[in-house]
Amino acid sequence: MAHYAFIDENNVVVEVIPGRDEWEIVDGITDWEAYYTTKREGLRAIRTSYNTVAGEHITGGVPFRGNYAGKGFTYDEDLDAFIPPQPYPSWTLNESKFVWESPVPYPEVELDEDGLPVASYVWDEEAGDWFEMGA
């Protein structure tokens, strides 16, 4: 089953729906993006891959359009990819993984005997660094 993102005039995703696979032909319809575009006035439908995250296909297939689209994501026509919202102004887009990266890498996390993290961190935009939660 394919999925389609509806984008507005600013290329922002407003809705994602399941739909027909691109190889299906029903009632002579062969272009499902064009078909679904006719179903939402003022919006454009673009196929998205449920199995694509951060530029990789999670089951080993071919990644498609950077990320599975989500509401609020932006479709970048130059990259042909769905980009999540920028979490902080200081973060920059990794154009090969299609994700935002902090200016300071996430700290290495120690794991306990059960393999669970002993600490987690939160980004502080004003300080420009990660801080341990609960510390």
Task: List PLM regions with ranges.
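Interaction-interface detector
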Residues: 1-135
